[in-house]
A protein has these predicted regions:
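Membrane-helix interface "capping/anchor" motifs
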Residues: 50-58, 96-106
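Mid-sequence acidic-hydrophobic segments that form the walls
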Residues: 93-98, 114, 139, 143
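Transmembrane helix boundary and interhelical junction motifs in multipass membrane proteins
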Residues: 34-37, 103-109
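Internal alpha-helical transmembrane segments of multi-pass membrane proteins
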Residues: 78-103
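Alpha-helical transmembrane segments and their membrane-interface boundaries
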Residues: 1-68, 72, 77-86, 117-152
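Generic transmembrane alpha-helix signature in multi-pass membrane proteins
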Residues: 74, 108-115
Length: 152
């Protein structure tokens, strides 16, 4: 029964957060606020807010660091994509662990960056702006509505 309630709440809060990012992306002129890996972040943030992987520093710096890793390979290593993607993901995972900012969903960011050939602006929108919005919703929904200690 606990998993059913946890699942329903996580689904509802994920819907609310992704809806806000989607509205900002498609109904304003402010840019892109969505990134595929944000969907995975929702599952952890709202399903398991006590996890060390979804604390604010992990979400923010995990997404930022892994995106930068993808950009390093995209912009500075003109190698075949089947070489750059694995190297960028491996570097991102290694650095997240070494710097204690592991956020598993962010491990996919280099794939998004390299396959999408994104510009440097991608760091601002969606990475930085999107993660700040996600963290704001995470704190508000977990603390104020669920009365959970987040961040821990």
């Amino acid at each position: 029964k606990e998993n059913i309630i946890r699942g329903l709440i996580a689904g509802l809060f994920s819907t609310i957060t992704i809806a806000a990012l989607t509205l900002l992306t498609y109904k304003t002129q402010y840019g892109i606020f969505l990134m595929a890996s944000f969907g995975s972040s929702m599952a952890l943030l709202y399903g398991y807010p006590e996890s060390p992987f979804v604390q604010p520093k992990n979400i923010f710096f995990g997404h930022l660091l892994s995106t930068i890793c993808g950009m390093i390979f995209l912009f500075f290593f003109p190698l075949p994509i089947y070489i750059t993607i694995p190297l960028a993901v491996g570097l991102a995972v290694s650095l997240m662990i070494m710097l204690d900012v592991s956020h598993p969903p962010a491990g996919g960011n280099p794939i998004i960056v390299i396959m999408g050939s994104v510009s440097l602006d991608y760091l601002i929108n969606p990475v930085i702006s999107g993660t700040i919005i996600i963290l704001a919703f995470g704190i508000i929904l977990n603390r104020l509505i669920l009365k959970k200690k987040y961040p821990i």
